[in-house]
Amino acid sequence: MRHIIRETVVGLAVALPVLASAGVAFAAAGDGDAERAARWQELQKQVFGDRKVEPGKLVSIDMPVRAEDAALVPVTLTVADKDQVKGLYLIIDDNPAPLAAHVDFGPAGDPAQLKMRVRVNTYSNVHAVAETKDGRLVASEIFVKASGGCSAPMGMTDADAMKGMGDMRMKFSDLTADKAMPATLMIRHPNFSGMQMNQVSREYTPARYLDRISVSQGARNVFTLEGDISISSNPVIGFEMRPEGSAPITVAATDSQGGTFDHTFPVPAVSN
């Protein structure tokens, strides 16, 4: 994953110089269309290099236009022609780390729909970019009004936020023959952004977030997600998969401080 702002973001005192040195223009809620368009052009270069990103309707974004909780904003990406798509990018243009997630789908994955919760730090365009199997990049856009999502405290001590870190649960819908199976993965992890102030010590909590999540059934990969601080605490990821046989589903995750977490889940029985 191309981190635009890497895990050196450990607090506002560090984050602001890092952003400035990276040449990232600071966003403002009152920015006009021209400023936002220029920022998107710069982000395309940072994330995709010289590759062309074309607008289109291959992937759609469903998010609340005005977020009730900027630290827990639900987002659903829906792919119009899933057989074309091998990966998805979610970019929150005006976040300190704009590239929220890059998801690559494996042979057991189904790109039809992907759900997660994200932090939105200020009024921002949000882009979803679908990468096709023939190498095209197709982007869609939505504007979201939110404020302070990356710096919002979790409402508990850091120690409490880290209790049970790495615990996982998986919920499955009914498995029907010849159809993709919806599933929801829940991982307990604070995903500290580095911009949250400890309400007791009044110091910034160092960044610690899940940077890679891989889901597989046996030797067949479902998806691999590379993430950053824009994914909300205690990530919840909704996805679809096409299981084969009875091999268990394995989840392996790592975080930016070297933590490793894994869990195995049995495959549900096929419904009649």
Q: Where on the chain are the PLM-derived regions?
A:
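Bacterial N-terminal signal peptides that target proteins for export
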Residues: 1-12
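Sec/Tat signal peptide C-region and signal peptidase I cleavage site
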Residues: 18-27
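A general "mature secreted/periplasmic domain" signal
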Residues: 28-156, 170-180, 184-271
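Long, charged amphipathic helices and adjacent flexible linkers at domain junctions
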Residues: 155, 160-167
